[in-house]
C-alpha cells in the first residue's frame, strides 16, 4: 500500500515550487521558502529532489512530455488516419485533400486539437511562465523550449508521419514558422494570460475564445490555398 502522506507531501512540494518559481524565478527562490510554502521540512524536499534545479527540470520535462503526447494523439488519430483512408496526402510539399468534405473534417478536427492544446497550456500557464522566464536567461532551459519542435532524426512526430508518407525532413523555413508562429504565440498567450486579463478586463472565456478565433482564421486561410504551409517547406529526401 502506498504511503499517501508522502505522495501528498511531494505534490505539495511541486505545487509550492510552481507558485514560487513563477513569481520569483528559480534562482531567487530558496529551498527553505519552498519548504515553508509546502509545509514540509527541507530534508523531505531533498528526499525527493537533489536540488531546486531538479524540481525545475521535473516541471519542465513533464510539461513537454504532456504537450508532445497531445500532438502525437492528433497525428495518429486524425493526420495519419486520413492519409490511410485516402482522404489526404502529401504531394510536392503540400497537403492535398480528396474533396471538400475532407477539408472540412480536417479543419474541424484541427480546431478541436487547437482548443485541447490551448486548454492544456492555460491549465499549466504557471509552469509555462517559469519556462519562459528561465529560457530568457540563456541556460539549458532555453534549449528545452526549442525542444518543443522535436525536429531531430529520432523525433516521434517525424517517425509517425514517415510511416504513411515516406521519409522527409523539415526545412529551415518550416522550423522558423513552427517556432515563431505556432509555438511562441501559444506559449506567450499562456505566460501573459493573467497579466493581459488584468489590463483588458476580459473574462477567461472571452480571452480564450478570441485566441481560438485568431488561430482558426490563420488555419482556414492556409487551407483555403490548398496548402498547409508545406509548399517549399517540407521536401521529400532524394
What are these regions (language model features)?
Residues 12, 112, 130, 177-181:
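Amphipathic alpha-helical interaction segments
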Residues 84, 119, 123, 155-167, ...:
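C-terminal peripheral helix-coil segments that are non-catalytic and often amphipathic
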Residues 59-109:
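Amphipathic alpha-helical linker/stalk segments
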Residues 12, 16-23, 70, 130, ...:
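Solvent-exposed, amphipathic alpha-helical segments
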Residues 108, 112-166, 213, 217:
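Amphipathic alpha-helical packing segments from all-alpha helical-bundle domains
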Residues 12, 16, 20-66, 77:
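Helix-turn-helix
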Residues 62, 130-134, 181, 185:
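Short acidic/histidine-centered micro-motifs embedded in hydrophobic/aromatic stretches
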Residues 1-8, 19, 73-84, 230-238:
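N-terminal intrinsically disordered/low-complexity leader segments
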Amino acid at each position: 500500500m502506498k504511503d499517501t502522506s508522502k505522495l501528498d507531501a511531494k505534490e505539495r512540494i511541486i505545487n509550492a515550487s510552481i507558485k514560487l518559481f513563477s513569481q520569483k524565478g528559480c534562482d531567487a527562490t530558496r529551498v527553505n521558502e519552498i519548504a515553508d510554502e509546502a509545509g514540509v521540512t527541507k530534508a523531505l524536499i531533498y528526499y525527493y529532489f537533489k536540488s531546486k534545479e531538479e524540481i525545475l527540470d521535473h516541471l519542465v520535462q513533464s510539461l513537454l512530455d504532456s504537450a508532445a503526447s497531445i500532438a502525437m494523439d492528433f497525428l495518429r488519430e486524425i493526420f495519419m488516419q486520413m492519409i490511410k483512408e485516402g482522404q489526404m496526402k502529401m504531394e510536392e510539399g503540400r497537403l492535398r485533400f480528396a474533396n471538400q468534405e475532407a477539408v472540412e473534417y480536417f479543419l474541424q478536427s484541427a480546431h478541436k486539437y487547437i482548443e485541447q492544446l490551448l486548454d492544456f497550456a492555460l491549465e499549466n500557464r504557471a509552469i509555462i511562465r517559469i519556462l519562459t522566464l528561465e529560457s530568457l536567461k540563456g541556460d539549458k532551459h532555453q534549449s528545452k523550449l526549442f525542444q518543443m519542435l522535436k525536429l531531430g532524426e529520432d523525433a516521434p512526430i517525424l517517425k509517425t508521419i514517415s510511416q504513411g508518407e515516406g521519409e522527409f525532413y523539415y526545412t529551415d523555413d518550416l522550423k522558423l514558422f513552427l517556432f515563431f508562429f505556432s509555438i511562441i504565440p501559444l506559449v506567450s498567450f499562456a505566460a501573459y494570460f493573467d497579466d493581459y486579463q488584468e489590463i483588458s478586463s476580459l473574462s477567461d472565456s472571452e480571452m480564450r475564445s478570441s485566441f481560438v478565433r485568431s488561430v482558426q482564421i490563420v488555419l482556414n486561410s492556409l487551407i483555403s490555398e490548398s496548402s498547409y504551409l508545406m509548399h517549399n517547406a517540407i521536401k521529400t529526401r532524394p
